Amino acid sequence: MARIAGIDIPREKRVEIALTYVYGIGLTRSKLILANTGVNPDTRVKDLSDGDVQKLRGATEEFTLEGDLRRKEGMALKRLQDIGCVRGRRHRMSLPVRGQRTRTNARTRRGSRKTVAGRKK
């Protein structure tokens, strides 16, 4: 397995797809990296030469990936919560942040239903 950005990428997959196993690299960024390095996207990871792997490592170093990216995103959310803005409060309460309705739906964000006892008449 080739290690890129501290992640072992799968040997049997095409390089274009295997790079997406690194947090912070999607398909678009993967294609950009391969175009810049001149590596064929259809090559399997196991068939890459050491030189190709070194090129890919060098190209990925210019991006914020893995732990640094997770930390950066976490700090952005923490900042929103600390300043007390609406988005931060919604994150803290585990509610949808971008204006979606919550009277019905929003089950993914709010979690499973909590049963409330009905009133007798």
Curated annotation (Swiss-Prot):
The record's keywords, sorted A to Z, are:
Ribonucleoprotein, Ribosomal protein, RNA-binding, rRNA-binding, tRNA-binding
Query: Where does the record place Basic residues bias?
Result: 100-121
Tell me how this protein assembles. Answer: Part of the 30S ribosomal subunit. Forms a loose heterodimer with protein S19. Forms two bridges to the 50S subunit in the 70S ribosome.
What superkingdom does the record give?
Bacteria
Q: Which gene encodes it?
A: rpsM
The record's family statement is: Belongs to the universal ribosomal protein uS13 family.
Q: What is this protein called?
A: Small ribosomal subunit protein uS13
Q: What does this protein do?
A: Located at the top of the head of the 30S subunit, it contacts several helices of the 16S rRNA. In the 70S ribosome it contacts the 23S rRNA (bridge B1a) and protein L5 of the 50S subunit (bridge B1b), connecting the 2 subunits; these bridges are implicated in subunit movement. Contacts the tRNAs in the A and P-sites.
Which GO CC annotations does the UniProt entry carry? cytosol; small ribosomal subunit
List the residue ranges of the region (Disordered).
91-121
- Which GO terms of type biological process are on file? translation
SUPFAM superfamilies for this protein: S13-like H2TH domain
Any one GO molecular function term: tRNA binding
Species in which this protein is naturally found:
Prochlorococcus marinus (strain AS9601)
